[in-house]
Amino acid sequence: MERGMTDIETAETPATHSGFVALIGAPNAGKSTLVNQLVGAKVSIVTHKVQTTRAIVRGIATHDNAQIVFVDTPGIFKPKRRLDTAMVTTAWGGAKDADIVLLLIDAERGIRGDADAILERLKDVRQPMALILNKVDRVKHETLLALSAAANEKVPFKRTFMVSALTGSGCKDLLDYLAQALPAGPWYYPEDQISDLPMRQLAAEITREKLYLRLHQELPYSSHIETEKWEEKPDGSVRIDQTIYVERDSQKKIVLGHKGETIRAIGQAARMEIAGILEQKVHLFLFVKVRENWGDDPERYREMGLEFPH
């Protein structure tokens, strides 16, 4: 008996989808926590201090046949100084370049202040937009419905999602939507890559997180951390030297702490987390230097991935 042209039945491979999704919102709405939850790994630092995210951090999630590149932007607020202006400009730039824009609103805080101002400006955005209400586990259902209606009255959102960035509730529905809404096309990054942030920069971000968590009240966020040295050792360990730049001597004393206790605690917490990510032993050395008005130095902005506002 004659066979057909082939013994193997071929099924058409599903088309891959990929694209950039900008996550915008007011400071401390939970953007970084949500990106980490959606990616399934830590790609953005999280603290209780407002404006922790300074530059755009891309977290990469693979869901079904789609690669979703999340752009975690700085919180949008009314800028008061040069660094603030650079961060807000960066945030809107991230939204302008994205395929889809997600607005994250803290459901506990509702629409007021910065969130209301963002909604007004979103009226001029042409990309598809979706609304995400965060911390829904802490708010009554009737309040959530009223909040959703008020936001959708101002801006024509394609979809509204109710999530808890902390627990992950509602995140699968959001990923399902993004996977089918992004354009068909090849993936931008290898399948196992979860961020495009260089490891030297991520290590500095982790130390900055530990600094803020330890000194939440005492230290203003006008501090900056640079990874000055990264040396792979023959025994498989790595030596990392980082400098914490502050603007005044009084801030340096706070970071050092009594007999160096504070900086040791910060270093230990950062070293453990960096070692966990690298899966190798880490020798972390922290130094504190005063650099007055570093916030007016264009070179520092370039290192943070920000455009220096003139």
Curated annotation (Swiss-Prot):
It is a peripheral membrane protein. CDD domains: Era (cd04163), KH-II_Era (cd22534). Residues 72-75 are annotated as: G3. It is found in: Cytoplasm; Cell inner membrane. It holds the Pfam family KH_2. GTP binds at residues 25-32, 72-76, 134-137. Residues 51-55 are annotated as: G2. GO terms for biological process: ribosomal small subunit assembly. Residues 134-137 are annotated as: G4. One of its GO terms (molecular function) is GTP binding. Residues 215-292 form the KH type-2 domain. Its main location: cytoplasm. Residues 17-184 form the Era-type G domain. Residues 163-165 are annotated as: G5. Belongs to the TRAFAC class TrmE-Era-EngA-EngB-Septin-like GTPase superfamily. Era GTPase family. An essential GTPase that binds both GDP and GTP, with rapid nucleotide exchange. Plays a role in 16S rRNA processing and 30S ribosomal subunit biogenesis and possibly also in cell cycle regulation and energy metabolism. This is GTPase Era. The gene is era.
